[in-house]
């Protein structure tokens, strides 16, 4: 059976502000560089053999109006002084023929580091559960990644955080994994 499997993936984030929730979301997508595409939300599998590329490299391969598959974390508020966060975490196994995981996290009151670390840990736990256990999952501070019996090669995250600055303004944050099918 044949199907299309994304061959590349890039990560991006953005913050937007506007008079309406929709305007702030559009501004966040523009800040992330992906407003000109039709975004289709998918679940959280990092495809086997997919290569991580920079946002700039990924965007060069895309055309305005193109349908893009994304794992999108999004948070929005108009509550004055409210801190909002959105993060995507990823965990990729050493064996590139296996799939990895992407996780989305949306929170209030968390810094970029806290939200990103939570999303990264969640992705690592989801991946380690496919190996049968999360109890042996260890965070290697020196390498800044999660390791499970030498099976996880790479973990990481991207996150965006913002504070609502005005009571008459909406603020939106997005973090996205964009999957490219060639």
Swiss-Prot record:
Molecular functions (GO terms): arginine decarboxylase activity
EC number: 4.1.1.19
Modified residue annotations for Pyruvic acid (Ser): 44
InterPro entries: Pyr-dep_his/arg-deCO2ase, Pyr-dep_his/arg-deCO2ase_sand, Pyruvoyl-dep_arg_deCO2ase
Cofactor comment: Binds 1 pyruvoyl group covalently per subunit.
Keywords, alphabetical: Decarboxylase, Lyase, Pyruvate
Pfam families: PvlArgDC (PF01862)
Gene Ontology biological process terms from the UniProt entry: arginine catabolic process
Catalytic reaction equation(s): L-arginine + H(+) = agmatine + CO2
Essential cofactor(s): pyruvate
Keyword match Cytoplasm: no
Domain of life where this protein originates: Archaea
Keyword NADP carried by entry: no
Positions of the record's site feature: Cleavage (non-hydrolytic): 43-44
HAMAP family: PvlArgDC
Family: Belongs to the PdaD family.
Name assigned to this protein: Pyruvoyl-dependent arginine decarboxylase
Record organism: Thermoplasma volcanium (strain ATCC 51530 / DSM 4299 / JCM 9571 / NBRC 15438 / GSS1)
Gene label: pdaD
């Amino acid at each position: 059976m044949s199907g299309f499997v994304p061959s590349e993936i890039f990560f991006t984030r953005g913050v937007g502000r506007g008079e309406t929730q929709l305007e702030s979301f559009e501004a966040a997508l523009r800040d992330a560089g992906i407003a000109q595409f039709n975004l289709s939300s998918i679940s959280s599998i990092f495809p086997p053999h997919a290569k991580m590329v920079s946002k700039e490299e990924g965007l060069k391969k895309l055309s305005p109006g193109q349908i893009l598959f994304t794992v999108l974390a999004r948070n929005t508020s108009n509550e004055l002084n409210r801190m909002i966060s959105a993060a995507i975490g990823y965990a990729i196994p050493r064996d590139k023929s296996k799939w990895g995981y992407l996780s989305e996290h949306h929170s209030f009151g968390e810094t970029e580091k806290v939200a990103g670390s939570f999303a990264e840990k969640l992705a690592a736990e989801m991946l380690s559960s496919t190996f049968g256990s999360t109890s042996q999952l260890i965070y290697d501070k020196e390498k800044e990644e999660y390791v499970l019996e030498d099976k996880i090669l790479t973990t990481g995250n991207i996150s965006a955080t913002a504070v609502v600055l005005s009571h008459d303004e909406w603020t939106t944050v997005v973090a996205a994994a964009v999957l490219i099918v060639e």
